[in-house]
Amino acid sequence: MNNFKCFLILTILFASSAFAEKHQFYYKNELILVEIPEGFCDASENEFGEFMVEFIDNQRKNGMDGPELQLVFDNCLDDLSNIYPWGYIGTVDIGQNNYTIEEMQNLFNLTMQEQLGEASYVKKLSSDLENAHKNTLKDYGVEAEVNLIQDTGVIWYDEDVVIIKGINTSVSDGEKLEEIVIGSSTLIKNDLAINFYITDLLDNGNLILNYSSKLEKASKKTSLLV
């Protein structure tokens, strides 16, 4: 099974460039700048990025609830036979509230810890994601058994960001594939969170510290761009 087909099975909700790129979009008529994690490139205009935008949009149509996609980024190789690691950036509209950014980030951190530590919540979330994912795969003619966001939880947080991890597993044509997803959420306004996700093959080495560091830096730099 080639990497692109493997990617199709597990895609979800997680040579390097020498500098960090920035991406911009509008939120409620306000220009927002975000920092792309170091070592990754904007994939908006290549084949992989265009496909990913379509695939994630189809997942949402099939019932996947999650951040609104703003950007897909890749490993800068522009090679469909070598797509890992890759990731995306999304936004979460929290809604109008009377909290400061600092208060909302703290509340966000606590909520993530509580929800991802609650077995019934994680089971329901996993089931919903798996159904949306499998239905989307069927749209592309792929049949697979998938287990998403296993072994999930908060691995680190501070006043600026919360970082989580999860494991995705799939079996297709008798072949098993495992991915690790590292994600982060940072509040840049009291009603807007920026979520980053990096996905890689689980057997690609010690990834948690490496990707957590990249997401922490990208999140903190993004918060300074506001």
Model-derived segments and their meaning:
Residues F4-A15:
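Sec-dependent N-terminal signal peptides
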Residues S16-A20:
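Sec/Tat signal peptide C-region and signal peptidase I cleavage site
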Residues K22-D57:
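Start-of-domain marker
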Residues I36, M104-F108, L207-L215:
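Stable alpha-helical elements in mature extracytoplasmic
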Residues I36-E38, N46-E47, G166-N168, Y197-D200:
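A mature extracytoplasmic/lumenal domain signature
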Residues F55-G174:
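Conserved polar/disulfide-associated segments of primarily extracytoplasmic proteins
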Residues E178-K189:
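Short, surface-exposed beta-strand/loop micro-motifs that present aromatic residues
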Residues N190-V226:
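Surface-exposed amphipathic alpha-helical segments
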